[in-house]
């Protein structure tokens, strides 16, 4: 955390990062508990949506988020968004998420209450390898590598699910198995027109390529270390918890904004049957999307919820990135508030 040269700086309870930034064990506890909250939301919200799901109304015209994603994965619903037979598959997914959230919560409590607050104090040699040193690029790249590999395997799970089980293809109105297409020329070309992609083979091919890049990059970061002397040109003095947080916020903010535009317009990854018709982009104080079909007052399609929520989350994540990036560079925001509060008593002296 930025202290502006004052080693005795204290933070209020609301500055949660201040309590874990330099204590890697507590840092892991916070991350595991946060993951548990996310997984709990997924399970609980699936049950909530299932309890409110109306089979007489098209799924795309209901304010749903979790159920349409399950439908695109070929779980629980037919091509018209109607429950197939019973709710057991959907209930099973929700319960697995709830149980997993309990395991993650227990892991968070374990790291918070019983295990060392700092991994440097751990009796396990492998655990000490993951002790965070913010201005040590070798430590950070080692930890980053493991994150990238885990993300790569998560992407592989999606690709293999589509290949073995199948996903919903709006082109034929049914769930089908999708073999990924590793045509590198196509993947390269879709960098500029990915919002218009209309072929599931290309979608899965892009994900397969992404998995390869993530796992290869992860292995590279684990195996390699800083070449030569660690200088200011390479980031010495810049690497900090605040800087890493700012970069993380920039990444997730950018992804959220891309997801907003993609979910608003693409009907292959976000089928009309499950998410509703494509949206119309409007501008006011900020951009926003509106439904292009007539719906009762206060009712919005899944697509409208997804696009707008992702965009505004992304927008504020980017603001958080700028805030923390400036703090990491040493900018003191208190100077701004002090300048504003003293504006009435400020004097201007003119010199000849």
UniProtKB/Swiss-Prot annotation:
An annotated GO BP: photosynthetic electron transport chain
Membrane-spanning parts: 27-47, 90-110, 142-162, 203-223, 243-263, 306-326
Induction details: As the light levels increase antenna complex levels decrease. Transcript expression level is unaffected by iron concentration.
Origin superkingdom: Bacteria
GO molecular-function terms, A-Z: chlorophyll binding
Bilayer disposition of the protein: Multi-pass membrane protein
Subcellular location: Cellular thylakoid membrane
Record's GO cellular component terms: photosystem I; photosystem II; plasma membrane-derived thylakoid membrane
Cofactor(s) annotated in UniProt: divinyl chlorophyll a; divinyl chlorophyll b
Keyword annotations: Chlorophyll, Chromophore, Membrane, Photosynthesis, Photosystem I, Photosystem II, Thylakoid, Transmembrane, Transmembrane helix
Subunit structure: The antenna complex consists of divinyl chlorophylls (a and b) and divinyl chlorophyll a/b binding proteins and binds less divinyl chlorophyll b than does low-light-adapted Prochlorococcus. Also forms complexes with PSII, consisting of a PSII dimer and 4 or 8 PcbA subunits. These complexes are also found under conditions of iron-starvation.
Family from the record: Belongs to the PsbB/PsbC family. IsiA/Pcb subfamily.
Additional observations: This high-light-adapted strain contains only 1 pcb gene.
Name of the molecule in the record: Divinyl chlorophyll a/b light-harvesting protein PcbA
Species of the source: Prochlorococcus marinus subsp. pastoris (strain CCMP1986 / NIES-2087 / MED4)
Chain's gene name: pcbA
């Amino acid at each position: 955390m930025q202290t502006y040269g004052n080693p005795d700086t204290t933070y209020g309870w609301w500055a949660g990062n201040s309590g874990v930034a330099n204590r890697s064990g507590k840092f892991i506890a916070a991350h595991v508990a946060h993951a548990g909250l996310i997984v709990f939301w997924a399970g609980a919200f699936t049950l909530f949506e299932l309890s409110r799901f109306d089979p007489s109304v098209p799924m795309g015209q209901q304010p749903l988020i979790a159920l349409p994603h399950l439908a695109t994965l070929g779980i629980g619903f037919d091509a018209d968004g109607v429950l197939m037979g019973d709710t057991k598959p959907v209930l099973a997914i929700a319960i697995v998420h709830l149980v997993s959230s309990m395991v993650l919560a227990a892991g968070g409590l374990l790291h918070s209450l019983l295990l060392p607050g700092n991994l440097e104090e751990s009796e396990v040699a492998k655990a000490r390898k993951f002790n965070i040193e913010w201005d040590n690029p070798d430590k950070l790249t080692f930890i980053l590598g493991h994150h990238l590999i885990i993300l790569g395997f998560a992407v592989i799970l999606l690709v293999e699910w589509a290949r073995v089980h199948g996903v919903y293809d709006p082109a034929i109105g049914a769930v089908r198995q999708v073999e990924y297409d590793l045509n590198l020329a196509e993947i390269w070309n879709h960098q500029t027109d990915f919002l218009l992609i209309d072929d599931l083979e290309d979608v899965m091919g892009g994900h397969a390529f992404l998995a390869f890049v993530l796992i290869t990059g992860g292995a590279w970061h684990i195996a390699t270390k800083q070449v030569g002397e660690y200088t200011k040109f390479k980031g010495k003095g810049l690497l900090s918890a605040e800087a890493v947080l700012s970069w993380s916020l920039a990444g997730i903010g950018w992804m959220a904004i891309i997801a907003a535009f993609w979910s608003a317009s693409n009907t292959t990854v976000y089928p009309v049957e499950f998410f509703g018709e494509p949206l119309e982009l409007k501008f006011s104080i900020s951009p926003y999307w509106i439904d292009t079909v007539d719906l009762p007052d206060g009712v919005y399609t899944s697509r409208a919820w997804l696009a707008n929520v992702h965009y505004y989350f992304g927008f504020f994540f980017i603001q958080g990135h700028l805030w923390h990036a400036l703090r990491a560079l040493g900018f003191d925001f208190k100077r701004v508030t002090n300048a504003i509060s003293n504006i009435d008593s400020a004097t201007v002296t003119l010199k000849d």
